From Swiss-Prot:
Annotated pathway: Cofactor biosynthesis; 5,6,7,8-tetrahydromethanopterin biosynthesis
Cofactor(s) for this UniProt protein: [4Fe-4S] cluster
GO process annotations (BP): 5,6,7,8-tetrahydromethanopterin biosynthetic process
Name of the protein described by the UniProt record: Dihydromethanopterin reductase (acceptor)
Keywords: 4Fe-4S, Electron transport, Iron, Iron-sulfur, Metal-binding, Oxidoreductase, Repeat, Transport
Enzyme nomenclature, EC number: 1.5.99.15
Quaternary context: Homodimer.
Binding of [4Fe-4S] cluster 1, residues: 159, 162, 165, 198
Cofactor notes: Binds 2 [4Fe-4S] clusters per subunit.
Keyword Metal-binding part of the UniProt annotation: yes
């Protein structure tokens, strides 16, 4: 296989709605920007991806990766049609690589079945038509158990209903129910203000949980490996290895 490395590369980075491997994906993309001279990254973010990126407090970092210049646009699915002009660049082979990390099981299932009804799945489909190689990091790589970290949450055993967290939340993401307080993750910006003011250490960030990778999702990942010009990677750090960055 012939791969193009070097200066003036253009990459599309697709983000879907997975929290697993999200922070690692950001670390890798920032590292690519540092290590590859004049690298241009166009970032595509699905609707669910935007919500998840915000709740993990990473949204602001997107502008350090895609600053809005030509071929460095930040494309949010909620602001653009599925047939965004950016995907046309892919079908014309204007980019060197497409990277989808992390890729949800839903995204992978659509891709392997030829469904291109969203910004990200359409981009991957057009990349295949334009001979643009896609590096995809599925969160459901192999059937079994994986450990992942959650965004902000409230430990109800520690919470004393002082409501200080509600007062400092800039987006109204924390609400009081009858006898407990809850973080609405769909509105959370991941700013951490609530954790800073909580006198009872009831705000939890990065709690580890176990999740099952279903066999059907792992099977779809296997099918993904069979698609033309698609390279499936187990972890975002393997992207660095692909580009010979140590």
């Amino acid at each position: 296989m012939n791969y193009r490395f070097g200066i003036n590369m253009k990459i599309v980075w697709c983000i879907t709605g997975a929290g697993h491997l999200l922070r690692e994906s950001f670390q890798v993309m920032k590292r690519l920007k540092e290590e590859i001279e004049d690298l241009k990254v166009t970032t595509l973010v699905s609707r669910a991806g935007e919500e998840v990126v915000k709740m993990y407090g990473l949204f602001g970092e997107l502008y350090n990766i895609s600053n809005g210049n030509y071929y460095e646009e930040l494309i949010l699915e909620r602001e653009h049609p599925y047939s965004s002009p950016i995907t046309g660049r892919l079908s014309l082979g204007k980019y060197d690589y497409l990277i989808c990390s992390p890729a949800t099981g839903n995204t992978v299932a659509k891709v392997v079945n030829g469904i291109a009804d969203s910004l990200v799945t359409n981009a991957i489909a057009q990349a295949g038509k334009g001979f643009v190689k896609s590096l995809i990091v599925p969160v459901d790589y192999k059937a079994g158990i994986v450990t992942t970290k959650l965004p902000y949450a409230i430990d109800k055993k520690k919470c004393k209903l002082c409501l200080k967290c509600i007062n400092v939340c800039p987006n109204g993401a924390i609400v009081k129910r009858d006898n407990f307080v809850e973080i609405l993750l769909s509105k959370c910006l991941g700013c951490g203000n609530c954790k800073k003011v909580c006198p009872y250490n009831a705000i939890i960030e990065g709690k580890e949980i176990k999740m099952r990778v279903r066999k059907i999702d792992a099977e779809n990942t296997r099918k993904l490996m069979e698609l033309e010009d698609v390279i499936v990677l187990k972890h975002p750090y393997e992207i660095l290895e692909f580009f010979n960055i140590r």
